[in-house]
């Protein structure tokens, strides 16, 4: 099966309030997704989704670190040629929490969690996907899970070996992540699942270059 996709989006952000330690902003957006699926030369599906989005974003200094929160609401709209099926008119809520804290001058702890919730049965493109690069490590090519309701938690410790504006920044790190999903109206064993994984790596960055080398291992899964 072959899939062809195209999309465009418009986003606007407005700072509502800020001081030396904190900032609060509001974001609104509109995106249109067009997906076509083919088996050989036969059109299998042709779907257009138009999605409205509103988010509230905040950051503040908290216990010697930086704490961030994003609340997001998405709604499928009957606009710009979108499909008029109930599945295309979904509602989805998301919450992202992150925390960055230097434990010493060189040792840094980072926490991130993303959770989403919908009472609707979502298209696969709108479900929260867990596993792979930028998510739970060790599931890059297989074992990814996705759901209408999901949560992902990541913890990372890194240590700054080099921190120089001239030659760059070099930091080894270790991380552990866990994710779980549940799909609506699917009582089978495939309607829910979880994965966990860990990675150890080396991260290097300078003005025009970023390199991240890591070994990732899947630890457990349903």
Q: Language-model segments: which ranges?
A:
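Gram-negative/organellar outer-membrane beta-barrel architecture
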Residues: 1-65, 222
